């Protein structure tokens, strides 16, 4: 799932913007005529709406290979018109430092005119090519679009343990990499995807409950207020689970927002089932694990004192599925993961919408039974339900994993409001 130049003006903090707008509007209204009052009220309403309007999409560095998904696809699909932020994933974390992931894809790959965002081919002697140059071109078309470099992810989170031993040195390395003069002005901040602090992911971390806030505090101190600092965090709201393992509330003061990963609750790593939706919004009768759903995650994080405006609603632009299933409804047994294009047990929405159309809904998301395969995924209709929940809860916006899973015309992202 990140020679120094002058700082860029960072987006005004949401809460500060809203409060100032409302306060200013109230003062002006006292002596304003009807037209002025209406304009001020409209401005205040727009500011309040913007508080929950972030749309953050992950772009995967490796997607330019087998998936053949490039930065140009963000533009051609219409997704760039909906996005407020892109998380470029992933940079590596190794040796206690932030590091490049795939340097060739990021900075060296030459793009033809046909594959370039602006229709201009790369030349052999230009200093920057690859995804970074394409992102820069995308920002030129969409000046309000912000790009964050995301570090870690499932595969590269093992390096955070060493990084946590010297947070200041880690933060310095991240800043130096994100702000490298070769790709100056591509990135507007950093996103940390540590899976998981003081808990188990691909490997088990024992850095302690305070390691995460110390790391995020060091990043904020180094990047300052002119850059975005965000983090993808666990959605495990169970008692004694991953949310409890780290001090996410203590770190909230340092981040612009959190991306709670409210997907992958269930999947074919439990090969025999029971089948269950991987991104349920709410609980339902027969759910395999209590508090494994989005509303439990948000309730727990808010209960810890984390402001709703700093929590984004997570969506998956893909499905998870089993095979060897006879029962149409959730809760059936299986024999293993269903076949997927790139990995068994997982498939893009753009494939599933036609290969295995939804046959029902449960817990605010969709499921489908096709032959002996059983899949769960979100559709434009279930995303609309989740948007109503997002707005009701006063959340800061929406994020999703990841852009290449959507249709060529951006069917899912266009359902986000």
Predicted regions and their residues:
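Secretory targeting and sorting signals
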Residues: 1-42
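Glycan-recognition patch characteristic of GH18 chitinases/ENGases
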Residues: 49-180
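Short, acidic/polar
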Residues: 63-80, 163-183, 237-250, 294-298, ...
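Extracellular low-complexity, Gly/Ser/Thr-rich intrinsically disordered linkers
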Residues: 64, 350-417
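Conserved, mostly hydrophobic/aromatic
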Residues: 86, 149, 192, 219, ...
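Substrate-binding surface in catalytic domains of secreted glycosidases
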Residues: 97-119, 197-347
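Generic structural signal for well-ordered alpha-helices
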Residues: 132-136, 171-178, 209-220, 248, ...
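Active-site groove signature of glycoside hydrolases
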Residues: 174-206, 264
């Amino acid at each position: 799932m990140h020679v120094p130049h002058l700082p860029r003006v960072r987006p005004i903090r949401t809460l500060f913007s809203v409060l100032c707008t409302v306060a200013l509007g109230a003062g002006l209204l006292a002596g304003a005529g009807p037209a002025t009052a209406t304009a001020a009220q409209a401005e205040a309403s727009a500011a309040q709406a913007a508080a929950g309007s972030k749309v953050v999409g992950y772009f995967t560095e490796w997607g330019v290979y087998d998936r053949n998904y490039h930065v140009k696809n963000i533009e051609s699909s219409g997704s760039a018109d909906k996005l407020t932020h892109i998380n470029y994933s992933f940079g590596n974390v190794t040796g206690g430092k932030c590091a490049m992931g795939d340097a060739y894809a990021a900075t060296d790959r030459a793009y033809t005119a046909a594959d370039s965002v602006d229709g201009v081919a790369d030349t052999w002697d230009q200093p920057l090519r690859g995804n970074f140059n394409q992102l820069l071109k995308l920002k030129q078309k969409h000046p309000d679009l912000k790009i964050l470099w995301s570090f870690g992810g499932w595969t590269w989170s093992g390096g955070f343990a060493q990084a946590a031993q010297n947070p200041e040195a880690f933060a310095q390395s991240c800043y130096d990499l994100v702000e490298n003069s070769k790709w100056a002005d591509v990135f507007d901040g950093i996103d940390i995807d540590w899976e998981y602090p003081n808990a188990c992911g691909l490997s088990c971390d024992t850095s302690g409950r305070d390691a995460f806030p110390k790391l995020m505090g060091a990043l904020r101190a180094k990047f300052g207020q002119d850059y975005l600092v965000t983090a993808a965090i666990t959605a495990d709201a169970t008692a004694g689970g991953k949310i409890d393992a780290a001090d996410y509330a203590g770190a909230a003061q340092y981040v612009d927002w959190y991306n709670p990963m409210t997907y992958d609750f269930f999947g074919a790593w439990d090969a025999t089932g029971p089948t269950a939706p991987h991104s349920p919004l709410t609980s339902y009768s027969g759910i395999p694990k209590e508090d494994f759903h989005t509303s439990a995650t948000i309730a727990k994080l808010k209960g810890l004192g984390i402001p709703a405006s700093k929590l984004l609603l997570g969506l998956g632009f893909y499905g998870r599925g089993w095979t060897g299933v006879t029962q149409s409804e959730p809760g059936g047994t299986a024999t293993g993961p269903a076949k997927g294009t790139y990995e068994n047990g997982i498939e893009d929405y753009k494939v599933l919408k036609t290969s295995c159309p939804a046959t029902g809904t449960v817990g605010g998301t969709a499921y489908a039974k096709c032959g002996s395969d059983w899949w769960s995924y979100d559709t434009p209709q279930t995303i609309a339900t989740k948007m109503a929940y997002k707005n009701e809860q006063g959340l800061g916006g929406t994020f999703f994993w990841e852009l290449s899973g959507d249709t060529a015309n951006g069917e899912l992202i266009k359902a986000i409001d």
